[in-house]
Swiss-Prot record:
Protein's name in the database: Protein P
GO MF annotation list: DNA binding; DNA-directed DNA polymerase activity; metal ion binding; RNA-directed DNA polymerase activity; RNA-DNA hybrid ribonuclease activity
Keyword Transferase: yes
Catalytic reaction equation(s): DNA(n) + a 2'-deoxyribonucleoside 5'-triphosphate = DNA(n+1) + diphosphate; Endonucleolytic cleavage to 5'-phosphomonoester
Residues annotated for Mg(2+) binding in this entry: 429, 551-552
Organism: Hepatitis B virus genotype C subtype adr (isolate Korea/Kim/1989)
Region of interest (Polymerase/reverse transcriptase domain (RT)), residue spans: 347-690
Pfam families: DNA_pol_viral_C (PF00336), DNA_pol_viral_N (PF00242), RVT_1 (PF00078)
GO biological processes: DNA replication; symbiont-mediated suppression of host innate immune response
Protein purpose: Multifunctional enzyme that converts the viral RNA genome into dsDNA in viral cytoplasmic capsids. This enzyme displays a DNA polymerase activity that can copy either DNA or RNA templates, and a ribonuclease H (RNase H) activity that cleaves the RNA strand of RNA-DNA heteroduplexes in a partially processive 3'- to 5'-endonucleasic mode. Neo-synthesized pregenomic RNA (pgRNA) are encapsidated together with the P protein, and reverse-transcribed inside the nucleocapsid.
Keywords, in A-Z order: DNA replication, DNA-binding, DNA-directed DNA polymerase, Endonuclease, Host-virus interaction, Hydrolase, Inhibition of host innate immune response by virus, Inhibition of host RLR pathway by virus, Magnesium, Metal-binding, Multifunctional enzyme, Nuclease, Nucleotidyltransferase, RNA-directed DNA polymerase, Transferase, Viral immunoevasion
Region (Spacer): 178-346
More info: Hepadnaviral virions contain probably just one P protein molecule per particle.
Family note: Belongs to the hepadnaviridae P protein family.
Amino acid sequence: MPLSYQHFRKLLLLDDEAGPLEEELPRLADEDLNRRVAEDLNLGNLNVSIPWTHKVGNFTGLYSSTVPVFNPEWQTPSFPHIHLQEDIINRCQQYVGPLTVNEKRRLKLIMPARFYPKLTKYLPLDKGIKPYYPEHAVNHYFKTRHYLHTLWKAGILYKRETTRSASFCGSPYSWEQELQHGRLVFQTSTRHGDESFCSQSSGILSRSPVGPCVRSQLKQSRLGLQPQQGSLARGKSGRSGSIRARVPPTTRRSFGVEPSGSGHIDNRASSTSSCLHQSAVRKTAYSHLSTSKRQSSSGHAVELHHISPSPARSQSEGPIFSSWWLQFRNSKPCSDYCLTHIVNLLEDWGPCTEHGEHNIRIPRTPARVTGGVFLVDKNPHNTTESRLVVDFSQFSRGSTHVSWPKFAVPNLQSLTNLLSSNLSWLSLDVSAAFYHIPLHPAAMPHLLVGSSGLPRYVARLSSTSRNINHQHGTMQDLHDSCSRNLYVSLLLLYKTFGRKLHLYSHPIILGFRKIPMGGGLSPFLLAQFTSAICSVVRRAFPHCLAFSYMDDVVLGAKSVQHLESLFTSITNFLLSLGIHLNPNKTKRWGYSLNFMGYVIGSWGTLPQEHIVLKIKQCFRKLPVNRPIDWKVCQRIVGLLGFAAPFTQCGYPALMPLYACIQSKQAFTFSPTYKAFLCKQYLHLYPVARRTALCQVFADATPTGWGLAIGHRRMRGTFVAPLPIHTAELLAACFARSRSGAKLIGTDNSVVLSRKYTSFPWLLGCAANWILRGTYFVYVPSALNPADDPSRGRLGLIRPLLHLRFRPTTGRTSLYAVSPSVPSHLPDRVHFASPLHVAWRPP
């Protein structure tokens, strides 16, 4: 007969009418009983023949995440001009006196941050924007391009101009100025011309000598023709990269080209569309180099669009436009939905490319990307704005993956010990926190994003792609991309972006100038940065408790008025360092702080309400007697595990689920086990912070146990010898139930760790409930007053130790040893400090 829930509760000693604990509890360690209960609850039956369930409520398997929804109305968020002050260490020292070694080291790590991957895999430009929304491909393309453009304008990205140069906006850092070769001078169009090939008059180029002269500028190599001068076409030409020098005289004009996006790595810049430092002659030469068909390593020829020259065309007809977009102006409409109609809406479509305010030399950077991008909702509560997702997961995968540095994450007990107090709280919102931290330009070639331009993107998405064929580019090829969908999309986007449609239809390659969110190193760097800043703030304002985790910064003070005055001073200090705060998102919490998914008050810590609701929904949807895919179980355990420390039986209650995940088998919930878990999560108990003097001690041997409660001594024996850790755990449970003490001295490290997941399942669950809210303090065996009773000797009474229990805060301690501060720095605010009143340093 299956085990009923009531019977199971009695067995686990969760009901009051259980027998004496000394008799009942050791039985739960019995292996035979644990096996029988597991069979009754269907916990051990992992091999099932029924099909697995792959979805429970919102939880799906690990590899089938929910499909993001595209919002055509997405707004691109605006980014302030973020420029973290380079002399941040000096500024902090002026404010607070000498910095600690720790603070200095952390701040030096991010000024500038460096990134050294073992191996970088370069992907074709086609993979730059991920085709996440096939229904809205064009819309997604332009919105993503606009987002990237916004980031570049805000100084967060570099734009690759040539293989070895990039431009950027915003204030340069000293390590960038060392690498500059002068600013772009926009008037001198021969060197740094802002006009790109679209707007070049045909007059200059039509008289340029072509033919033998072109050959003379290029030297033959085994890779085909190579330029002798730097910026003509650095990098390897493809297998068919020879230049067709036999050009009819009438074609001596500049033809445009969209550089090929897939294929061999040739380190051309955005090819002819970016202005290289070339003379008119070399521009002509390069235009022929570009228009020749190149064979790509992926096996198909990449067709580059250009206008077939007609001998009848006279010089007086004006310039031939080289841009894919502008070529439509001179062509006849192919249908009602031809792009010619859109291109003719405007006379001036602006330049093909934009240049940044500053130019910089960079390590050799190929015309490729190293990660894809796509857009999603900014967060579940804000669907009007978009967020750019950058996938640099190549650095975290495979045999060449980078081992990212570990950093301290405060656990629940540490957080409670630090923040559970009667302080008044507020949290600061750092806007675009990741984009505060500058990256060294040497990291740019590893962190590239971009796009191959609209024609290639559209061609790649249409399955019947006629753009990529093995013939020469003709006028017909130009119109191959015309379609009703594209026409309608572009017409709608024209209202939003206007003449920028032209700019965004060109290819672009961008490298990160500030740390990207998708890089594995970024969380570590952000954690170092904010923790160092908070450490400085705590010493500048000794009456304020400042604490941070990633970009979440909280301030605590004794009263609301005090908190407000601190808030003003600290905000000004952070702004002086170049840290951007979002004043609209400052949250005032009163005495209950919401932080990292917890509510923390003077009474202790509990999970936030939205997590409790999620758990209730999860149980409502949880099927009984149906095998659930172990990947879904991982999701369920993730949610339940977060709140496990607040339940009666804690983590041990979830052990059967952990076991099934480890063995990669499906898990079947029996009605009793589900009811047991439901009841566990119905009543959550706060985790609290305590300090006390230890008066109760427990010890055990495999055959017996002993307690010292004040001046009383007790002992008992086990029916059968037990493993030493199990015996020590039982002794601790007896000490708690006999004395009611919240603080117990023990010499066993496993009991001390309070992780009872390795014990027999039933015992682990029961012990977790009995020892809830109990704290342990380590006492060496030789000094343990309970040592003699556990060995059966009651006559000898060792003196009780005066052991004060101080809550630990793990590696997230607040107390930096403060160097001596010069006397001329006045106290900021004269209030009793919470660190001295409400706090005893751990």
